A protein has these predicted regions:
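Residue-level signal for secondary-structure boundary elements
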Residues: 35, 121-125, 295-296
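Cytosolic juxtamembrane segments of membrane proteins
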Residues: 96-136
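Structured extramembrane domains adjacent to transmembrane segments
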Residues: 124, 128-293
């Protein structure tokens, strides 16, 4: 059953077990939903700016007129209309802004599925869960603390889970976790006024695990020495963990905050791109290279 937008809009969480083409079709529907709300948010934002500007210009023009009393009634009506228009536009913009999703998340998943489809059976299902709610949602806050003068709220957002199986029988599981910090501090300016400043920090942590088919590959314990040698991660990412746990190969990497989910660029090693799909592709390639080396040695 395809995605139900009415249900999706309640939580902004998409969860389904289906074939890759079916999941991809759902993601395109979600993308259309997001594009509509982005357009509406922009439209009502322009309405806010227009009503504010017209009201301000009218007030200044009438206030500097020598015939202020003559235009008082008209001015009050006009300014009241602009005020009401501003409030309506603000409410509408806020409503659509709440449904303005993080494009890069579903774009990353869509691009990764496109890459995985090449080595998956056409009828092989994948299990997907993607959370498109904002990373600083109250339900994702784990603790509060202090860093120097900053009051910090810490959030953990496990927004992506994807699992499936390749044609060779290897099972995979991909997880995406956003670590988000909301920082705020209060200070006094030179004039003695109390002011506040806020900023945020975030990083994406991606974890990939592979469970090889024991009939085709050597025991996982034999792969430990090969994993670090086979790593080919983008230069802008950081390896956090690589190793073997029981019967699985594990690799965890971190990305900068400004990563995107668009297709892999012509020059993926350019630090200005920070392509999430490129990082995931290189993680798969690194682990599979270790598997293939193990298979060749076994043969």
């Amino acid at each position: 059953m395809s995605v139900d937008i009415a249900d999706f809009e309640k939580t902004f969480v998409y969860q389904r077990t289906a074939t890759i083409p079916e999941v991809t079709a759902d993601l395109k529907t979600i993308g259309q939903f997001d594009a509509y709300h982005e357009q509406q948010k922009s439209k009502w934002g322009k309405g806010m700016a227009t009503s504010f500007f017209i009201g301000l210009v009218s007030f200044v023009s009438i206030g500097t007129s020598n015939s202020f009393q003559q235009y008082a009634v008209v001015a009050s009506s006009w300014l009241g209309l602009c005020f009401c228009a501003f409030i309506v536009c603000a409410i509408k913009r806020s409503k659509h802004g709440a449904s303005d999703l993080a494009n890069r998340r579903y774009e990353l998943l869509e691009e990764v599925l496109r890459l995985l489809e090449k080595d998956s059976a056409s009828n092989e299902p994948v299990a997907v869960r993607i959370d498109l709610q904002k990373p600083d949602h109250a339900t994702k806050r784990v603790r509060e603390g202090k860093v120097g003068p900053w009051n910090v709220q810490y959030f953990l957002d496990p927004w992506l889970e994807l699992s499936g199986r390749f044609l060779d029988g290897t099972s995979y599981r991909l997880q995406g976790l956003e670590k988000y910090q909301a920082r705020r501090k209060t200070y006094r300016s030179r004039s003695g006024k109390s002011k506040s400043k806020s900023k945020s920090k975030s990083a994406l942590q991606v974890t990939l695990s592979l469970k090889p088919n024991p009939k085709r590959y050597a025991e996982s314990e034999e792969l430990s020495a090969k994993l670090k040698q086979s790593l080919q991660l983008p230069p802008w990412s950081n390896q956090k963990f690589v190793g073997v746990h029981k019967d699985r190969l594990l690799l965890t990497a971190l990305t900068p905050a400004d990563w995107h989910g668009k297709p892999i660029p012509p020059n993926p090693d350019d630090d200005s791109f920070f392509s999430g799909p490129h990082l995931v592709a290189m993680m798969f390639l690194s682990l599979y290279q270790a598997l293939n080396q193990s298979q060749l040695k076994q043969e």
